[in-house]
């Protein structure tokens, strides 16, 4: 809240000074000086307050006022004094002959303050701004990461990456072709590229569904020239039957085509025995004509509790 005007200041003129008012003030000060600014307006014949006369003389009318652009030496002096004194413009102006405090303040706000900010300094402390340092640091880190990605892309182009993926998939197919298709001619495991197995193990996406024991047993069959047929692999592996009798002694055609005998099909009370007698005789005939490997069958781990009965 501003100071209320006194009775002596009531009706005084305010606003811009006229040239006639400037001449009266200059002539009076040249003749009498400015010992008392409160009594000067009445003595000089001015309808102004003492403060207005003082500011007009100090900032505009005194003969030693230096006009024009600030020099480089004056700018350096203002910066050094502001770092020590702060915004004490009157004390700064006392070290610059011919410059007023108001002129120095305006020059600071319009030029020097903006210049310090652009240079990365705090205009109040004259120290480097930490926020600019952190912002520039994040930009430098982003540029560094981008440079690393560019270098990596130059070392491994996209075409080479696509070619490597294609070679991996073809290696998988080649290995399955060796495992699943029958081979009448002798084949050595040395003919298989070892990179195929390495690529398949690294991928994990396909090898996770393959039994490693099953894979190793069939790789040994390559050297023994005992490669099983595709149907044998389907019947044994995908049905989870890995009995040694089926791996070392492939079944004959008669054994694979042999119909199974379901005990549940027999009648409990003898009902329907005549109707099933003809089909039963045929099954007995087929069974008698087939040489079953009983000594191997009951030795298998699938029949631990069944004893052979003649």
UniProtKB/Swiss-Prot annotation:
Induction: Induced by abscisic acid (ABA) and gravity in roots. Its main location: nucleus. PROSITE patterns: HTH_MYB. Pfam families: Myb_DNA-binding. GO terms for cellular component: nucleus. Residues 37-61, 89-112 bind DNA. InterPro entries: Homeodomain-like_sf, Myb_dom, Myb_TF_plants, SANT/Myb. Residues 9-61, 62-116 form the HTH myb-type domain. GO terms for molecular function: DNA-binding transcription factor activity; transcription cis-regulatory region binding. It is found in: Nucleus. CDD domains: SANT. The keyword Acetylation does not apply. It comes from the Eukaryota. The keyword Repressor does not apply. Highly expressed in roots and at lower levels in leaves, stems and flowers. Keywords: DNA-binding, Nucleus, Repeat, Transcription, Transcription regulation. Interacts with FBX5. Probable transcription factor. PANTHER family: F14D16.11-RELATED. This is Transcription factor MYB53.
């Amino acid at each position: 809240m501003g100071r209320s005007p006194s009775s002596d200041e009531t009706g005084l003129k305010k606003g811009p000074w006229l040239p006639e008012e400037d001449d009266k003030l200059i002539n009076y000060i040249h003749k009498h000086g400015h010992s008392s600014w409160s009594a000067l307006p009445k003595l000089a014949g001015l309808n102004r307050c003492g403060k207005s006369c003082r500011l007009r003389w100090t900032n505009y009318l005194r003969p030693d006022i230096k006009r024009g652009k600030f020099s480089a030496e004056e700018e350096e002096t203002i910066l050094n004094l502001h770092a020590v004194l702060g915004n004490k413009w009157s004390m700064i102006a006392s070290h610059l002959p011919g410059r007023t405090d108001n002129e120095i303040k305006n020059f600071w706000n319009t030029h020097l303050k903006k210049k310090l900010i652009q240079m990365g300094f705090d205009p109040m402390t004259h120290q480097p701004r930490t926020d600019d340092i952190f912002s520039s640091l994040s930009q430098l880190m982003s540029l560094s990461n981008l440079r690393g990605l560019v270098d990596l892309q130059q070392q491994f182009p996209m075409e080479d990456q696509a070619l490597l993926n294609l070679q991996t998939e073809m290696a998988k197919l080649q290995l399955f072709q060796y495992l699943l298709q029958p081979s009448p001619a002798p084949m050595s495991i040395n003919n298989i590229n070892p990179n195929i197995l390495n690529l398949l193990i690294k991928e994990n996406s396909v090898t996770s569904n393959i039994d490693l024991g099953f894979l190793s047993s069939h790789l040994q069959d390559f050297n023994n020239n005992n490669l099983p047929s595709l149907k044998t692999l389907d019947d044994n592996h995908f049905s989870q039957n890995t009995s040694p009798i089926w791996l070392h002694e492939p079944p004959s055609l008669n054994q694979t085509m042999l119909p199974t005998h379901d005990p549940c099909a027999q009648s409990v009370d003898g009902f329907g025995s005549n109707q099933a007698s003809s089909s039963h005789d045929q099954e007995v005939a087929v069974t008698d004509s087939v040489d079953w490997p009983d000594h191997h069958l009951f030795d298998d781990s699938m029949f631990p509790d069944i004893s052979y009965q003649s």
